[in-house]
């Protein structure tokens, strides 16, 4: 419960800093890990939802994971992209339409290993929860 509250607070602060700086700040995690902003269509609300996530470049796209910082609850954006796989990705202030594809096997392993190499807590997340962490490839559309 405490960890969930801390995560929500951190995400709220991250969003505010990104907004207040007009996107100049909040593009990396501590240590330099890349942050992308995904925008997904809410499966229930029909409203667009914007979420900051750690990401790794791979195969012409970006690998992301629904870790929810190691909480048992699957993040809402995962459910959203499973219903509506089209959304947007913002990389360094450049937003593009994108397709979200859940991956498995070798690609899933490579993305997750890349995330661990940038933010070692990902290893702890998988150890500490009982659910599978869904992994996605976000492929930006060509302009």
Language-model features: locations:
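Extreme N-terminal tail/first-helix region
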Residues: 1-29
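N-terminal short leaders/motifs
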Residues: 1-12, 42, 86-95
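A generic structural micro-feature
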Residues: 30, 45-47, 81, 130
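Short beta-strand segments
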Residues: 33-69
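Short hydrophobic/aromatic beta-strand or adjacent loop that forms the aromatic wall/cage
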Residues: 35, 132-135
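Short beta-strand element of the conserved SAM-dependent methyltransferase core
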Residues: 38, 136-141
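Short strand-connecting beta-turns/loops that link adjacent beta-strands
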Residues: 58-60, 94, 143
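Short, structured beta-strand-loop surface elements
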Residues: 68-122, 128-132, 140
């Amino acid at each position: 419960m405490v960890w969930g509250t801390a995560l929500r607070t951190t995400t709220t602060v991250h969003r505010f800093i990104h907004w207040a700086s007009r996107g100049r700040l909040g593009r990396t995690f501590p240590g330099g890990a890349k942050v992308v902003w995904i925008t997904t269509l809410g499966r229930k609300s029909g409203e667009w939802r914007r979420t900051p996530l750690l990401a790794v470049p791979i195969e012409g796209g970006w690998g992301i994971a629904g870790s929810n910082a190691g909480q048992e609850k699957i993040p809402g954006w995962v459910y959203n992209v499973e219903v509506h796989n089209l959304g947007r990705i913002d990389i360094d202030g450049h937003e593009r339409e994108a397709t979200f594809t859940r991956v498995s096997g070798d690609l899933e392993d490579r993305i997750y290993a890349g995330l661990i190499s940038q933010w070692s807590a990902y290893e702890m997340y998988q150890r500490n929860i009982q659910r599978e962490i869904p992994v996605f490839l976000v492929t930006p559309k060509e302009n």
